[in-house]
Design a protein with these regions (language model features):
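Periplasmic/cell-envelope proteins involved in peptidoglycan metabolism and beta-lactam response
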Residues: 1-293, 316, 393-403, 521-522, ...
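Beta-lactam-recognizing serine transpeptidase/beta-lactamase-like catalytic domain environment
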Residues: 2-7, 75, 221-230, 271-321, ...
Length: 598
């Protein structure tokens, strides 16, 4: 009986054990979880709690200042007040934005668009700038209502002030927000995704130097996002100061000379490469980009006069008669003609087998002309003749030595111009090169295009003894001087350069020179006029008809340098649709040289 009782007891115990076992397992599991949470996960939860309590904020540095060659400030900084929000501390977004809309007097739907867009781009407990550059009224009303605006701060930030505004816009450029593409190209911009960076001009070209490095501030926050204490700060590093070669007083005065007309000017020292003035007209005021008004900025980009387009480095124009000295030089170098050899100019040039004449600008022609007279009076027929005897295979490579058809790398958005040859025409036009193309090229027309900067560099090489200089617009960065670079052009006979320079003096000082109107014995200037065709016209009647459309009128060009005895500056001016290089562009160049020499 006892044995049977024992088996019954064991059976009962087994059943009790099997019944309680799952509860025991659950109890052990719960104990281990508590142990894990209290011991092993304690540090993790402490970190999470800290992350909810401690906020890491970027501290943006002031951008470096920009000075002119005389240490006058061109671009400095001013402090603005921005409204920054941390959405995690806001319980009701709609209620928050309604109140904020009333305080800052901005429509709620406008605030919502910015708020929800920024919200979608950030991680939890990150902040973003909702409103920039609050005015005094907005600032006062927000501060008075801080208690009703959880997660809200007013942060000081920096904006740019371009002191001379519109006249220096083509040089300084402007700031804006980096796009995803910008950040992809330059990952360093990622830290500045909520701040403006350089998007054009010097601000873009030297953004890495001007921008500085971001710092960080670690703050303890209360439940509403208010700052309880600043725990630590990793300081930011200020951007580097840049000194330009630009003379801002000269820049201002020359910009006014254009009087709103479309055009460009480059003033460069032929022996140093320093650019003393760079004008693109019309221009824009870079300070306009501080107001953050998207629609108004959009209208600026759509302006038909293209104020954001830097004509001095990106505008491509037929060099017209300003190319003739180089055609003359290659003809001398190739022994196609001598300096004193004369050609009869009767106003027309005929090619065998072609019934259409190539006409000169002066009816009846210039009579018998040697190279000096041909350049002084700008004889087209003379240069038709020597271009005909040359080939594009000799002209194009020679012009390339003087910088035509290639970028000088002054700015990223600089144009290369067009230096056409047989290969170019076949590739671009699907046509063979004709002798007529070479003839047109001989007077700087046809397919050839150049920027004002390229023309300035080519003339600098003419007068400095055959050195193609690299232009410099930055003189120093944080006190460290930029390097001067030049490339020697191979000239067979240096006397040929002297012949060309004598001719350029005659352009101004000869009684029949095309720029005799700017002759001044007190400051002797040499140079070359040019009239760049916008539309090719074959007869005078058609020309007068075309002139009625201002946009189809010829461009006025002049390249000048001085003083003749010891040239220190080369100036190129182009006035779009200005028609007369001697009457419109030459006086601007003369003014520039006079101002530079004062």
């Amino acid at each position: 009986m006892k044995g049977k009782q024992f088996l019954t007891d064991q059976s009962i115990l087994r059943r009790i054990f099997l019944f309680l076992f799952p509860f025991l397992i659950l109890l052990i599991f719960a104990f281990l979880q508590i142990l894990n949470l209290m011991v092993f996960q304690a540090e993790k939860f402490k970190t999470q709690a800290d992350s909810n309590r401690i906020l890491k904020e970027k501290v943006f540095p002031p951008r470096g200042l920009i000075f002119d060659t005389n240490d006058e400030i061109i671009v400095d900084n001013f402090i603005r007040q921005d409204l920054v929000v941390t959405p995690n501390f806001i319980e009701d977004y709609s209620l928050y934005l309604s109140l904020l809309s009333e305080l800052v007097e901005i429509e709620k739907n406008t605030l919502e668009q910015v708020f929800y867009k920024k919200l979608s781009e950030i991680k939890p407990f990150q902040s973003f700038t909702l409103l920039r550059d609050l005015n005094d009224r907005q600032l006062a009303k927000v501060k008075l209502n801080f208690k009703d605006l959880p997660g809200t701060e007013i942060n000081s930030s920096f904006s740019r002030n371009v002191v001379h505004g519109e006249s220096s816009g083509a040089v300084t450029g402007y700031l804006g927000f980096a796009s995803k593409q910008d950040i992809l190209i330059n990952p360093n911009l990622k830290n500045f995704n909520d701040q403006q960076v350089g998007l054009l001009g010097i601000e873009k070209e030297f953004d890495d130097e001007l921008r500085g490095t971001v710092g960080y501030r670690y703050s303890e926050k209360d439940a509403r996002g208010g700052v309880l204490d600043v725990l630590s700060v990793e300081p930011s590093t200020k951007g580097k100061n840049i000194k330009l070669s630009i003379d801002i007083e000269l820049q201002d005065k020359l910009y006014k000379e254009f009087r709103g007309r479309k055009g460009a000017l480059i003033a460069i020292e032929p022996d140093t490469g320093f650019i003393r003035a760079m004008i693109s007209s019309p221009s824009y005021n870079p300070n306009f980009f501080n107001n953050f008004k998207t629609e108004e900025i959009k209208l600026l980009f759509q302006n038909k006069n293209s104020p954001l387009f830097n004509r001095a480095i990106s505008g491509q124009y037929p060099p017209a008669s300003t190319l003739k000295p180089f055609i003359g030089l290659v003809a001398l170098e190739e022994d196609v003609i001598t300096w004193q050899e004369k050609i009869l100019d009767e106003g027309e040039f005929f090619v065998e087998g072609d019934k259409r004449p190539y006409t000169g600008w002066k009816e009846g022609g210039h009579g018998e002309v040697n190279m000096e007279k041909a350049l002084a009076e700008s004889s087209d027929v003379y240069f038709y003749n020597i271009a005909y005897d040359l080939t594009v295979n000799s002209i194009a490579p020679f012009l390339k030595k003087f910088g035509f058809g290639k970028s000088s790398d002054l700015f990223i958005n600089e144009s290369q111009g067009i230096l056409p040859d047989k290969k170019w025409k076949l590739g671009q036009k699907g046509e063979f090169w004709f002798k007529g193309d070479t003839i047109n090229m001989g007077i700087g027309q046809g397919y050839i295009l150049a920027t004002p900067l390229q023309i300035a560099l080519a003339y600098s090489a003419l007068i400095n003894g055959g050195k193609l200089i690299s232009p410099r617009i930055v003189q120093s960065i944080e006190g460290e001087e930029t390097k001067f670079v030049s490339e020697k052009i191979e000239i067979k006979d240096i006397q040929n350069l002297e012949y060309i320079k004598e001719s350029l003096i005659s352009v101004v000082e000869s009684n029949t020179g095309t720029a005799k109107n700017i002759f001044d014995p007190k400051l002797r200037i040499a140079g070359k006029t040019g009239t760049a065709q916008v539309k090719s016209i074959l007869d005078d009647n058609k020309y007068q008809e075309i002139r009625e459309n201002v946009l189809l009128r010829d461009h006025a060009l002049f390249v000048g340098y001085g003083p003749v005895e010891d040239p220190s500056i080369v100036v190129v001016a182009i006035v779009e649709n200005g028609e007369s290089g001697s009457l419109v562009a030459a006086p601007i160049v003369q003014k520039a040289i006079n101002l530079y020499e004062q």
